[in-house]
């Protein structure tokens, strides 16, 4: 049998660095919903492809949006 070819996964590029965005606004819920799961959890960097600084900014913005009740807190599904 031939050996399966192992391909490296394509590196994701930070969406904010690519667009030269100045920052992440907690009031922009449409943008922030891309970075939370259907359960309301913040997605990891390796999933979203964000750089370190922008992932921190997204996490802070999501937490602020939750405080103001623009985004839901995590649900357990019980």
Swiss-Prot record:
GO molecular function: small ribosomal subunit rRNA binding; structural constituent of ribosome
Highest rank taxon of the organism: Bacteria
Keywords for the protein's UniProt record, in alphabetical order: Ribonucleoprotein, Ribosomal protein, RNA-binding, rRNA-binding
Membrane-spanning ranges: none
PROSITE patterns reported for this sequence: RIBOSOMAL_S18
GO terms under cellular component: cytosolic small ribosomal subunit
GO biological-process terms attached to the record: translation
Family: Belongs to the bacterial ribosomal protein bS18 family.
Function: Binds as a heterodimer with protein bS6 to the central domain of the 16S rRNA, where it helps stabilize the platform of the 30S subunit.
Subunit structure, as described in the record: Part of the 30S ribosomal subunit. Forms a tight heterodimer with protein bS6.
Classification via HAMAP family: Ribosomal_bS18
Protein name (database record): Small ribosomal subunit protein bS18
Organism: Nocardioides sp. (strain ATCC BAA-499 / JS614)
Lineage: Bacteria, Bacillati, Actinomycetota, Actinomycetes, Propionibacteriales
């Amino acid at each position: 049998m031939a050996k399966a070819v192992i391909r490296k996964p394509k590196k994701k590029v930070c969406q904010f660095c690519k667009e030269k965005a100045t920052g992440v606004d907690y009031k922009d819920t449409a943008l922030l919903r891309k970075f939370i799961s259907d359960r309301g959890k913040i997605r990891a960097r390796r999933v979203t492809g964000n750089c370190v600084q922008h992932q921190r900014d997204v996490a802070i913005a999501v937490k602020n949006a939750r405080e103001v009740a623009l985004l839901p807190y995590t649900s357990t599904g019980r």
